Amino acid sequence: MLYFRVSAMGSRSRKCSGVGDISFAERKIVMSSWENNVRKVVPYTPGEQPKEKNIIKLNTNENPYPPSPAAKAALEAFDSDDMRLYPAPDAAELVDAIAETYRVKPEQVFVGVGSDDVISMAFMTFFNSDKPILFPDITYSFYDVWAEVYGIPYKRIPLTADFRINAGDYSQPNGGIIFPNPNAPTGVLESTEMIESVIKANPDSVVIIDEAYIDFGGTSVLPLIEKYENLLVVQTFSKSRNMAGMRIGFAFGSKKLIKYMNDVKFSVNSYTMNRVTIKCGAAAVRDGEYFRATCAKIIGTRENAKKRLSQLGFTFPDSMSNFIFAKHKTASAKTIFEELKKRKIFVRYWNKPIICDYLRITVGTDNEMQALYDALEEILKEAAK
């Protein structure tokens, strides 16, 4: 930016000044003017990550069990000297392991730094229409953040009173569709038939199904990628694979869809997956026995939690995820949230319309859940006085 000022000597009435020549007041203007060109967004708010020890963490839907022994062995066997080398841009070892496990071709697999990275890349790649993309009004709150960041028009579609998707609402003109199945934060699972009806009604749009929680009782729509070229199915290692800290997400789609995503990815950052992640991820995804065993434990604990929470006066939509979206009949969700926190038990609460009466409770170990029930019983007794 150029500034003109009068010379005290009068030899030159005006001059072109740099920042070093101008007054403090003028300098403030120069230093702040860059903000006019900043993309300002309201960022996504992640779940609280408490630093203290001896807590019960049921607020971010992490898996309460350790990673696969195969992943641990891969970590221990990793040669630290390899850290000086760039990883393979195509992460072929991980991609091949995922393709082998899910019985698809490697060309139908995309990997990224968690499913957030995968979906963000999909937004960048596929949602470039002047028409709004569509997603539920109660859903994963990162969707509207990505839309804002990338300047994508969007429209929130209301769920039904029982937190379900009405397929007909997604037949309107759009620039793309995304929703989770099971939904987050409700845990409600939609049928494959309903999802296919949405895909059929939108042949000119990419439809993204976010299956972060599908392994806890749902049926993946993965087989439909062979039938619909415009379908992208996204999954993650963060929930059912016990590896949230490794940040591994992946997607399935037609070869054409995946090629477009890789073209964009390699134009932004070729080396998204580090060497340790590739090795450990490949080992973990091949350990099907451990994966199925931990999922079964979480499902069993979840079903018991439904009974116990019902006995304590909670209602909730039937969850097919690793969490329960619960509302108490009389006690305030905010009060319960705060009282649990005092007892070092962390759950998720949103002070937002429609869902402000609900708590999202991650399914922990049986011991963690028993501590939760004991604390809730105590809190509810105090609230009833």
Where do the model's predicted regions map?
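PLP-dependent aminotransferase-like
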Residues: V30, T125-P180
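Conserved PLP-binding catalytic core of the aspartate aminotransferase-like
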Residues: I299, Q311-R343, L359
